[in-house]
């Protein structure tokens, strides 16, 4: 049986990257929340 996590750097960036987050209103909210919380990494 195949494992569910098949890492791919490209896919990771394209779905969870910073630029992708900034593209939508909700994505910007995610970044803002992470900034407020003081996360070291805002996005992948």
UniProtKB/Swiss-Prot annotation:
Signal sequence, renumbered to the chain: none
Coiled coil: none
Keyword entries, A-Z: Ribonucleoprotein, Ribosomal protein
Pfam families cross-referenced by the UniProt entry: Ribosomal_L34
Top-level taxon of origin: Bacteria
Annotated Gene Ontology cellular component terms: ribonucleoprotein complex; ribosome
InterPro entries, per the entry: Ribosomal_bL34, Ribosomal_bL34_CS
GO BP of this protein: translation
MF terms (GO), sorted A to Z: structural constituent of ribosome
PROSITE patterns (UniProt xref): RIBOSOMAL_L34
Keyword Lipid biosynthesis in annotation: no
Cystine residue pairs: none
The keyword Ribonucleoprotein belongs to this UniProt entry's keyword annotation: yes
PANTHER family, per database record: LARGE RIBOSOMAL SUBUNIT PROTEIN BL34M, MITOCHONDRIAL RIBOSOMAL PROTEIN 34 FAMILY MEMBER
Family classification: Belongs to the bacterial ribosomal protein bL34 family.
Name the UniProt record assigns to this protein: Large ribosomal subunit protein bL34
Annotated source species: Kosmotoga olearia (strain ATCC BAA-1733 / DSM 21960 / TBF 19.5.1)
């Amino acid at each position: 049986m195949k494992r569910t996590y098949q890492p791919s750097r490209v896919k990771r960036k394209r779905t969870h990257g910073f630029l992708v987050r900034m593209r939508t209103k909700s994505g910007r909210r995610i970044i803002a929340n992470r900034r407020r919380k003081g996360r070291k990494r805002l996005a992948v």
